[in-house]
Amino acid sequence: MPRIAALPDHLVNQIAAGEVVERPANALKEIVENSIDAGATAVDVELEGGGIRLIRVGDNGGGIHPDDIELALHRHATSKIKTLNDLEHVASMGFRGEGLASIASVSRLTLTSRQEDSSHATQVKAEDGKLSSPTAAAHPVGTTIEAAELFFNTPARRKFLKSENTEYAHCATMLERLALAHPHIAFSLKRDGKQVFKLPAQSLHERIAAIVGDDFQTASLEIDSGNSALRLYGAIAKPTFAKGKTDKQYCFVNHRFVRDKVMLHAVKQAYRDVLHNALTPAFVLFLELPPEAVDVNVHPTKTEIRFRDSRQVHQLVFHTLNKALADTRANLTESVSNAGEVLHDITGVTPAPMPSENDGENLFDSASNHPTGNKPDTRNAFGSSGKTAPMPYQAARAPQQHSLSLRESRAAMDTYAELYKKTDDIDLELSQFEQARFGNMPSETPAHKTDTPLSDGIPSQSELPPLGFAIAQLLGIYILAQAEDSLLLIDMHAAAERVNYEKMKRQRQENGNLQSQHLLIPVTFAASHEECAALADHAETLAGFGLELSDMGGNTLAVRAAPVMLGKSDVVSLARDVLGELAQVGSSQTIASHENRILATMSCHGSIRAGRRLTLPEMNALLRDMENTPRSNQCNHGRPTWVKLTLKELDTLFLRGQ
């Protein structure tokens, strides 16, 4: 067996680089984090060949002392910690002293730096782990690091790299995360000599819009909770913005991007009542806590962390998001923020640029940021701006109208007449309303009396509730309502589903069970063996949900009682679905954790079905319930319950003012 021998420092660095520098994006992260720790207010990044051929990072930070510039490329050499106590209280982005040494061991690295009190800069080069002697160089205050030909001396590692486009995408994503965490720092990115983006120092609100997108910003809810010792802030997207991807999920702990299971689980739990399982929420969350309350020294990449009190963190994240999402009700926020834009896309109307207050300058242009008048390219890292604001239109294509046949016209008029036919009750309501509001009106003779449109009975705009008042039912599916300055479309089944669900949850929390009523005649149905077994195992649980079933023998079950709230539902289908849920859940201990899922299934059965004709009082009652129900902007599956089209959007649709 060979004798034990100490490995050369250069080989040790190359082995360490396998953990620290897996790809160009990791090298970029280490260098930019050093710039942030140096107090830079501007960081410029240039990439060639996706970062494989060249990574160049320049900053205007404090720079490196000439006597320390060689030491900066040695392993475990750092200015950020000196004792173990410093490590426990570290607040800097980097602290291990491995980053630059690892990069220098697998690339051709050039480090040039100058401090403010130095007459010139100092430059040192490293190739294959060998350092050159420091030399004088011309350079402004700050530091520039160039890492060329990454993995040139480790061909086996280089074979594992992906294409230049893929590696560039990882680099751009990494830089976007760092820019998002530090909005007070200006960032720019060039790819193969072409400017990709240039972000000035800006507010967090503006930085989120620039990185995550204006569509996210429009559909997001701001959050800010906690105290000086533990604070959570940022923005979370409304459930209707949810996607099937996780590319818009950002967790930052003390301004460090992390992938933490505790925070992600808390987010998932907060969204579980308003989001379908196949969709993922979008969010930008910043958690600030004392450095000693979190261990960032878990992995060299520092994306994995450990909280000292993970339960406290979980509760803060869950309760903050849950409260924000519970307030997504019709009287507080819109269900869908871009309904007008979606409608414009359907009709093929093309937006044209809108003149801004700054004579065409984009979101990031200001006199203070760009005194020379140069306007930066604010596209995101992949070349798209993501701007979706409503704009004036040009080259518009008007919606086409088609003539109806005589038969279709008569059918439409019959439907209209049925919806708007007046009854004595409606006349009485209108008369009472007019008298209460306007006093005694001059009487009309029958010969001169004219029919009053139903909409005349709607209160004035100043008296309208958030969802207004219903004026019609469309196709047996939607409710059409008029609000203060807009037209509303409400999915009556989805809305009723959410209202019933929240009512049942509240009743279960207050009473421990759902109030039930016995059926005059029990309803029997043929059941499967699994359904019979579920009844035998969970009869008491079913009673807690307001369902009383009995086994009649011969695989026949009888429904004897059903929840009062769901009295008009199909009790057989309801019983089958609840039994199916219980069979899937299994043991009684896990039923509690799946209670909301069972209630969601039940609420679906008790909701208004498509095709059912509602009276105006019934429609308005549903609208008022929505205004007073938490999370009423989405149904139990995360779909929107209502959309709003403002008068401006309707005018645009009909080309008014063009």
Swiss-Prot record:
Residues 114-138, 355-405 are annotated as: Disordered. One of its GO terms (biological process) is mismatch repair. Keywords: DNA damage, DNA repair. Pfam families: DNA_mis_repair, HATPase_c_3, MutL_C. One of its GO terms (cellular component) is mismatch repair complex. GO terms for molecular function: ATP binding; ATP hydrolysis activity; ATP-dependent DNA damage sensor activity; mismatched DNA binding. Residues 114-130 have a biased composition (Basic and acidic residues). HAMAP family: DNA_mis_repair. Belongs to the DNA mismatch repair MutL/HexB family. This protein is involved in the repair of mismatches in DNA. It is required for dam-dependent methyl-directed DNA mismatch repair. May act as a 'molecular matchmaker', a protein that promotes the formation of a stable complex between two or more DNA-binding proteins in an ATP-dependent manner without itself being part of a final effector complex. This is DNA mismatch repair protein MutL. It comes from Neisseria gonorrhoeae (strain ATCC 700825 / FA 1090). The lineage of its organism: Bacteria, Pseudomonadati, Pseudomonadota, Betaproteobacteria, Neisseriales.
